[in-house]
Regions:
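Internal, well-ordered alpha/beta segment that forms a basic, Gly-enriched binding/recognition surface
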Residues: 147, 162, 166-205
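Intrinsic-disorder-associated, low-complexity terminal segments enriched in Asp/Asn/His/Tyr and depleted
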Residues: 2-4, 26, 49
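Generic short N-terminal amphipathic or hydrophobic helices
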Residues: 25-28, 64
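Short, low-complexity intrinsically disordered segments enriched in A/P/G/S/L with frequent Arg
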Residues: 15-17, 23-24, 34-37, 48-52
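Active-site diphosphate/adenylate-binding microenvironment
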Residues: 92-142, 148-155, 162-178
Length: 354
């Protein structure tokens, strides 16, 4: 058996003399008593067609993974295998994704490498319920939307899976939450319902054991941070951090400043490098960290400086031509983003952003 190669040689007893050279079967087997496998296709039978004669079959394994398995992804090969299995399931169970694949003429059985997986346009989260199965979701997260715009909706079947995802990502880049205090300056997110960012920050603040949300009380925020002896993370929406920098220019001690969410129409958009320089000068820090997430995703990517983002092992981001969603670009090129987020287990793990 070669599970790392996805191949398995079986010696089977032929019971029908009419078996052809190219026979195809389905098996449900347990590999090593641990990994459930599904839809094992057999082909390339060798030997002679005779009753009870021992024959050799080469079979391809499609591993049926569980949500637990995505957190054990350790390399690119494991990611590729998991991505293909999740694609096959979501192509069957997620109606908008299934319809999209049909409209663009993609047949599931022809998608045999991750590079061939089509990515669902993110706009469909505004017009369709991107969800697998019939079980009601535990929550529905929504995106920010200006007046007159339709927000995206992301049904979350399992809040436990979402919590496990953001906690695992946080530990990957920042270690155990208990060593930090987390202060959240997220005014526009707190003023509306359905924010996945607020949900995440609330749970991480509880895990840290210190910190909190500050809506408009900037003086209270700065006083609390000044008294706090622990290392601190100040997580703020970009425009709110800029306001804090202009009004108070506080020199923050033992603090990671982490921006997220953009200007949301409250401030002018400026190049990220210039914005980070303004914050560094005002707060007296050497680098600005960033969190990248969105309502349509389950996972987060983090930059720990230099605006270079890193993803957890179950998330992958690639660039594509903005005018051709099926034309990938090389690493380092500028373009639209294709995001594979394997933690989006019950919605769609393959999202095409603008």
């Amino acid at each position: 058996m070669y599970p790392d190669r996805g191949l398995l040689f079986l010696r089977l007893q032929a019971t029908e003399p009419t078996l052809r050279e190219e026979s195809r079967f389905n098996f449900f087997i347990t590999f090593g008593g641990v990994t459930p496998l599904s839809e094992v296709e057999t082909f390339c039978r060798t030997g002679h067609d005779s009753v009870l004669e021992s024959s050799v079959f080469l079979v391809t394994l499609h591993v049926m993974i569980t949500p637990d398995d995505i957190f054990r992804i350790a390399d690119g090969a494991a990611f590729d295998a998991a991505a293909l299995e999740i694609f096959r399931r979501q192509a069957r169970e997620c109606a908008p994704y299934r319809e999209y694949l049909a409209r663009i003429g993609v047949r599931t059985e022809h998608v045999d490498t991750p590079e061939k997986i089509p990515y669902l346009p993110i706009e469909l989260f505004k017009t369709h319920t991107v969800y697998c199965g019939e079980t009601p979701p535990e929550a529905v997260f929504t995106s920010s939307a200006t007046t007159g715009m339709t927000p995206s909706r992301h049904p979350m079947r399992s809040l436990a899976l979402y919590e496990r995802t953001f906690r695992a990502a946080f530990r990957t880049f920042y270690g155990e939450p208990g060593q930090w205090s987390l202060y959240a300056l997220l005014p526009n997110y707190l003023r509306r319902k359905g924010s996945s960012l607020v949900y995440m920050a609330d749970r991480l603040i509880a895990d840290c054991g210190s910190g909190g949300f500050y809506l408009d009380d900037c003086e209270g925020l700065l006083a609390a941070m000044e008294r706090d002896p622990k290392p601190k993370i100040l997580l703020g929406v970009s425009y709110a951090l800029w306001d804090l920098a202009e009004r108070y220019a506080p020199k923050l001690r033992d603090t990671v400043v982490m921006e997220t969410g953009g200007m949301k129409g409250y401030r002018e958009e400026i190049p990220k490098e210039e914005f980070h320089r303004i914050l560094c000068d005002a707060f007296g820090v050497g680098e600005i960290h960033s969190e990248y997430g969105m309502a349509e995703l389950t996972s987060q990517a983090y930059s720990q400086g230099g605006n270079v983002f890193r993803c957890p092992g179950w998330m992958r981001v690639t660039a594509r031509d903005v005018n051709d969603p099926f034309d990938p670009l090389p690493a380092g090129a500028r373009g639209g983003l294709n995001i594979a987020d394997l933690a989006s287990w019950w919605s769609c793990a393959f999202i095409q952003t603008q």
